[in-house]
A protein has these predicted regions:
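Short pre-functional
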Residues: 75, 125-139, 155-156, 223-224, ...
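Basic, Lys/Arg- and aromatic-enriched nucleic-acid-binding interface segment
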Residues: 87, 99-106, 110-138, 142
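DNA breakage-rejoining catalytic core of tyrosine-based enzymes
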Residues: 87-89, 100-115, 163-173, 183-187
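Active-site-proximal segment of tyrosine recombinases
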Residues: 140-141, 212-213, 222, 230-241, ...
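Conserved tyrosine-mediated DNA breakage-rejoining catalytic core shared by Y-recombinases
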Residues: 143-179, 245
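Catalytic-site neighborhood detector that most strongly recognizes the C-terminal catalytic loop/helix
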Residues: 160-163, 232, 239-264
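Active-site/catalytic core of tyrosine-dependent DNA strand-transfer enzymes
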Residues: 172-211, 221
């Protein structure tokens, strides 16, 4: 049947119907193309494939994060194949666990953010504000329009964010002040894509002596949100994360929080 003739194409079509992002589709297609026999790999073949993925074409070792992503893409394909009755077990079960160092998010200092907003021209100020004060990704900054600001309900609608899922971000007075007078079309002033937004933010940050990226601006929003609320579920929802495991790296305790914890631990009874 068609599934057996080209299972990878059938899987990618199913993923596309589930409205995954183009970036996810591209990455998955690239990884699945390296499988020597997508539906016929036994334990030895699976481990041999995994061994071949440990190094890049230039001979340098692949980062743990990259390997983890490759394993996840392959595992999801095989999981789909099992659901379709094409496999009886998931070959990913034979793969070793990828151990990644758990790093805490690095955020833009508040003083730097103040100067970045103060010195920016209007379009750049809006980009910085949407990242640092609304937690938007570069693709979301590029896509958001003035029509997405819902003042009646006090939210900013993020249409088809990561994974092509809509979500709402609460509006703050500070964010609205930085965005300025509303207009028509894109909030950033012109049509842009994710790469252009990320590059523009990177250039602006470097020009102002700040060794940070667009993602570090977003990390600032999530870190402040978690510090103020302590609610990881709400933080995951507002950030557009599908699970809590990826949000905990933004949980940076304030000195007051740590002091209260130390006082509680220092009491007996």
């Amino acid at each position: 049947n068609g599934l057996m003739d080209d299972p990878i194409a059938a899987h990618l079509a199913a993923v596309r119907r589930d409205r995954y992002s183009d970036a996810t589709l591209t990455a998955r297609a690239r990884i699945l193309a390296t499988l020597p026999d997508p539906l016929g790999m036994d334990r030895l073949a699976t481990l041999a494939w995994w061994e071949s993925r440990q190094t890049r074409p230039d001979g340098e070792p692949r980062a743990a994060a990259s390997l983890s992503g490759e394993k996840a893409h392959a595992a999801e394909f095989w999981r789909w194949a099992m659901r379709e009755g094409l496999l009886e077990r998931n070959p990913a079960d034979w793969l070793p666990k990828v151990r990644q160092a758990k790093t805490m998010a690095v955020v833009v200092p508040e003083g730097d953010l103040y100067r970045l907003l103060r010195d920016a021209a209007t379009p750049m100020r809006r980009m910085v504000a949407l990242a640092a004060m609304a937690g938007l990704r570069s693709a979301e900054i590029a896509a958001v329009t003035w029509a997405d600001i819902d003042r009646d309900n006090g939210v900013l609608w993020v249409r088809e964010g990561k994974g092509r899922k809509d979500r709402s971000v609460p509006l703050s007075a500070g964010l609205l002040a930085e965005l300025g007078e509303p207009g028509d079309g894109p909030i950033v002033g012109k049509a842009m894509n994710a790469k252009a937004v990320s590059a523009a933010l990177g250039r602006y940050l470097r020009a102002h002596g700040s060794d940070f990226t667009a993602h570090k601006l977003r990390a600032r929003y999530l870190t402040r949100f978690l510090a103020a609320t302590g609610d990881a579920v709400a933080a995951a929802q507002v950030a557009g994360h599908s699970d809590l495991s990826s949000i905990t790296r933004y949980a940076v305790a304030s000195s007051d929080t740590m002091r209260r914890g130390a006082e509680a631990a220092g009491r007996i009874g």
